[in-house]
């Protein structure tokens, strides 16, 4: 129970005394030896101060520090550790993994330059075993992996005594005699560096928090154990005291009997070693150093040094809340935070922070106010309640009592100043937006989001729409009334949509487009409605507004059908036949939809292809009548018609041919003839009626697409023959014939062409054609030769493989005799037995046994 004021914290070295106006300087380590105080900084300086203690009538003390000098060590690294060896008049300084010896008075390095290299941290043996009063025993954790080293440090030299390996990487060390208490990566151990024997203490995870190892007396150490426990251990590996329960985040510990003092990132806690109870808590933020020097406990932040002064016992036994005067207690806590017990202080201090936050808020110091509100975990409804009408009417919130501030509402706070009021509203918008997705908002997200919506709507803020299209907890009734009041009808539609009232949302947007209500939020609201209904799952709602959309714009409105996801298009309500039926009175939309079916979805249905082709044709004819065929749009429609007629094989050719006949559409007529296989008629139209030789060549290409080379050659020969039949008098056809041959040499049979050509044509005229034909012929011949060679090679490989499978060759000569009749062989015909014997075929047939084993049944 924290009921004793055991220590007071007094300043020893103020920030200005140490660093002046140099904010970048920070304290890294301290050392105190008698009246001498040494401070090491991050910029490689050592500062020497003399402390003068003055006793106070209350039993406490104050300290005055007088700066003596400071010295730069010549490195660019921070001073990591300091340790005074008063017997040697030396200061051991760890910097840049090197321990340097400097004079305690003038801070000059020893002339010999003696130093210990390769140290990450060190500890002085306060129970030396060497026996020499003019040396100090030092243990270092080496930069070498899993290694500790023992040194003897003299006035001007150092000497290594021992190097010991450890089972894991050591992180911290304390020394007592021959015993090292080591914090390894996963456990604490006691190691006798003389014998090499070790004793495991208990496991510890150094990755979660840094270890603490402190020598607190002869052969006894204080360690930071798991679960926020301060553990005591002797060199024998046992504990003679019960552990103390301190913070989970302890970063430093010291002993000032009978107290264990612990430092975390917010507090200094004092625990009794006698009953293990926590006796005192002193608020101390940003502290990172806690050490005891001959009974004097020093703590430090990065900017200042403080001393924990133990109070007389009679001063320690006080009950801070005995008088129950809450207001006076709060004032005392604010003025002397370090004197208040931890548990009660947290509650009181949180309230103080909240009050301070409202004070800063009233002064329009919004950044400071926000930090105070967040750190004090303010119920944000306390802040929202200052703004009239922002809390929902259904909210049951009541302000804290006693009140955190003296203001009834924002009008009183700003005294009606509209500019200040606007600033306050902007701050609340920012603050609510920051906390709405954090734990602070848990339990009253509806209040926060509804208030935020009201602020956005009132300020015409762009984030209003972002709020409504993402997950939110805006209350529908309050929010809808507020949006309607501020004429935010588009946003109101989004609110309806979020609350699954799509019909109300769309009707509201339709009214905006129709001009029944005014809201200029979106200039493209019509397109937005189209897009919304395109992906709307409510089929009835889509059909309800389909006519309105198509009446506004057939080309855009039809997108509710054409851009709808494919799985929905296959539903009964949106099947193509129903949609086509509904689009009959909207011709442009009908064309767009049929294009979607035929071109985009590639539906293979004759009805759709024919319908689209007829609509194209009717539009072309209508435009030709009205514009004389000169309008660009008519040309585009005609191009679509021709492309459909060429690419599709599903439309009713005869029906379209009847409609095209006599309509003055020769190209379309030619395409339709081609679809019926009437290629000569088609080419005749292109050549003689239209005189479009390029179109005739294209016809041969697209009409034979997918039909094979023979079909294409036949079409080109037909076209060439048509050119040549006109005779030499038709100069343009002669030129066309020459161009056809020279540009499409590969498509012709050269032999047939040469028989057709007039004798009067020169070789030079047909040079490109002949060269191309020769090139193709040579290429074909060489390709054939290569193929033949490859085939022969492949056959040879197969023959070789076959011979290998048959086995070794059998040699038959004139001296070889039949093993049955002993006569020579007259011809290369024989029977071979498995034993290798060769006989005539007639001998093998007349005998039942071989001359030697095996039997005839085994011959080959």
Swiss-Prot record:
It is found in: Cytoplasm; Early endosome. Its main location: cytoplasm. Disruption phenotype: Embryonic lethal, both before blastula stage or during gastrulation. The keyword Transport applies. Transmembrane segments: none annotated. Pfam families: CNH, Vps39_1, zf-Vps39_C. Residues 24-297 form the CNH domain. CHCR repeats lie at residues 564-732. GO terms for molecular function: SMAD binding; transforming growth factor beta receptor binding. GO terms for cellular component: CORVET complex; early endosome; membrane. It comes from the Eukaryota. Plays a role in the TGF-beta/activin signaling pathway. It associates with inactive heteromeric TGF-beta and activin receptor complexes, mainly through the type II receptor, and is released upon activation of signaling. May recruit SMAD4 to the vicinity of the receptor complex and facilitate its interaction with receptor-regulated Smads, such as SMAD2. Interacts with TGFBR2 and ACVR2B; in the absence of ligand stimulation. Interacts with TGFBR1, ACVRL1, BMPR1A and ACVR1B; in the absence of ligand stimulation and to a less extent. Interacts with SMAD4; the interaction seems to be mutually exclusive with the interaction of SMAD4 and phosphorylated SMAD2. May interact with ALOX5. Interacts with RAB5C. Interacts with VPS8, VPS11 and VPS16. Component of the putative class C core vacuole/endosome tethering (CORVET) complex; the core of which composed of the class C Vps proteins VPS11, VPS16, VPS18 and VPS33A, is associated with VPS8 and TGFBRAP1. Belongs to the TRAP1 family. This is Transforming growth factor-beta receptor-associated protein 1. It comes from Mus musculus.
């Amino acid at each position: 129970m924290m009921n004793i004021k055991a220590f007071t914290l007094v300043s020893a070295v103020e920030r200005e005394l140490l660093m002046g106006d140099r904010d970048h300087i920070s304290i890294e380590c301290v050392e105190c030896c008698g009246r001498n105080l040494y401070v090491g900084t991050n910029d490689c300086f050592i500062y020497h101060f003399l402390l003068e203690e003055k006793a106070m009538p209350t039993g406490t003390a104050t300290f005055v520090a007088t700066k003596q000098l400071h010295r730069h060590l010549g490195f660019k690294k921070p001073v990591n550790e300091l340790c005074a060896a008063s017997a040697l008049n030396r200061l051991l300084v760890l910097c840049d993994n090197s321990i340097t010896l400097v004079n305690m008075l003038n801070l000059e390095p020893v002339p010999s330059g003696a130093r210990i290299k390769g140290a990450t941290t060190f500890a002085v043996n306060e129970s030396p075993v060497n026996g020499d009063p003019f040396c100090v025993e030092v243990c270092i954790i080496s930069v070498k992996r899993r290694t500790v080293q023992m040194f003897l440090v003299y006035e001007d030299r150092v000497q290594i005594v021992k190097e010991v390996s450890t089972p894991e990487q050591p992180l911290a060390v304390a020394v007592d005699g021959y015993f090292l208490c080591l914090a390894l990566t996963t456990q604490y151990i006691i190691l006798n560096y003389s014998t090499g024997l070790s004793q495991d203490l208990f496991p510890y995870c150094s990755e979660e928090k840094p270890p603490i190892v402190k020598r607190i007396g002869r052969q006894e150490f204080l360690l930071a154990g798991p679960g926020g426990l301060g553990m005591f251990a002797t060199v024998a590996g046992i504990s003679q005291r019960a552990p103390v329960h301190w913070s989970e985040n302890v970063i430093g510990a010291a002993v000032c009997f009978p107290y264990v003092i612990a430092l975390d990132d917010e507090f200094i806690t004092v625990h009794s070693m006698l009953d293990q109870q926590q006796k005192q808590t002193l608020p101390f933020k940003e502290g990172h150093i806690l050490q005891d020097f001959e009974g004097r406990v020093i703590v430090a932040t990065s900017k200042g040094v403080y001393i924990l002064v133990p109070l007389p016992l009679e001063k320690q036994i006080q009950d801070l809340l005995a008088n129950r005067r809450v207001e006076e207690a709060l004032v005392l806590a604010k003025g002397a935070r370090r004197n208040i017990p931890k548990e009660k202080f947290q509650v009181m201090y949180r309230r103080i922070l909240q009050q301070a936050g409202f004070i800063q808020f009233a002064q329009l110091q919004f950044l400071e106010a926000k930090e105070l509100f967040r750190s004090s975990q303010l119920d944000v409804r306390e802040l929202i309640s200052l703004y009239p009408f922002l809390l929902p009417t259904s909210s049951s919130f009541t302000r804290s009592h006693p009140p955190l501030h003296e203001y009834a509402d924002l009008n009183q706070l700003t005294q009606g100043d509209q500019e200040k009021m606007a600033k306050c509203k902007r701050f609340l918008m920012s603050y609510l937006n920051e906390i709405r997705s954090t734990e602070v908002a848990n339990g009253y997200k509806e209040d926060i989001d509804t208030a935020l919506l009201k602020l956005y709507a009132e300020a015409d803020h762009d984030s209003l729409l972002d709020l409504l299209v993402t997950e939110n907890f805006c209350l529908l009734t309050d929010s809808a009334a507020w949006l309607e009041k501020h004429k935010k009808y588009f946003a109101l539609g989004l609110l309806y949509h979020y609350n699954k009232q799509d019909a109300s949302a769309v009707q509201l947007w339709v009214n905006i487009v129709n001009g029944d209500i005014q809201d200029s939020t979106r200039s493209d609201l019509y397109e937005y409605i189209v897009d919304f209904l395109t992906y709307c799952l409510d089929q009835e709602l889509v059909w309800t507004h389909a006519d309105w959309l198509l009446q506004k714009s057939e080309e855009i409105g039809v997108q509710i059908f054409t851009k709808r996801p494919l799985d929905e298009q296959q539903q009964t309500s949106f099947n193509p036949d129903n949609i086509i039926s509904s689009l009959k009175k909207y011709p442009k939309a009908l064309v767009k939809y049929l294009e979607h079916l035929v071109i985009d979805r590639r539906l293979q249905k004759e009805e759709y292809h024919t319908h689209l082709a007829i609509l194209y044709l009717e539009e072309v004819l209508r435009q030709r009548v009205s514009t004389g065929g000169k309008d660009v749009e008519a040309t585009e429609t005609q191009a679509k018609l021709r492309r459909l007629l060429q690419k599709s094989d599903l439309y009713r050719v005869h029906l379209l041919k009847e409609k095209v006949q006599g309509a003055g559409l020769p190209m379309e007529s030619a395409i339709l003839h081609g679809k019926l296989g009437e290629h000569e008629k088609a080419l005749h139209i292109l050549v003689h009626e239209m005189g479009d030789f390029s179109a005739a060549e294209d016809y041969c290409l697209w009409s034979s697409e997918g039909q094979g080379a023979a079909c294409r050659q036949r079409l080109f020969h037909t076209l060439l023959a048509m050119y040549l039949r006109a005779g030499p008098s038709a100069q343009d056809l002669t030129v066309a014939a020459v161009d056809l041959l020279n540009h499409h040499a590969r498509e012709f049979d050269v032999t047939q062409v040469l028989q057709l050509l007039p004798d009067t044509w020169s070789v030079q005229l047909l040079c490109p054609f002949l060269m191309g034909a020769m090139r193709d012929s040579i290429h074909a011949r060489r390709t054939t030769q290569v193929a033949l060679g490859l085939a022969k090679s492949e056959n040879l490989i197969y023959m070789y493989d076959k011979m290998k499978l048959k086995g070794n060759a059998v040699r038959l000569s004139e001296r070889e005799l039949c093993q049955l009749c002993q006569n020579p062989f007259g011809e290369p015909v024989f029977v071979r037995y498995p034993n290798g014997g060769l006989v005539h075929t007639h001998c093998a047939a007349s005998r039942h046994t071989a001359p030697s084993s095996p039997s005839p049944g085994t011959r080959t």
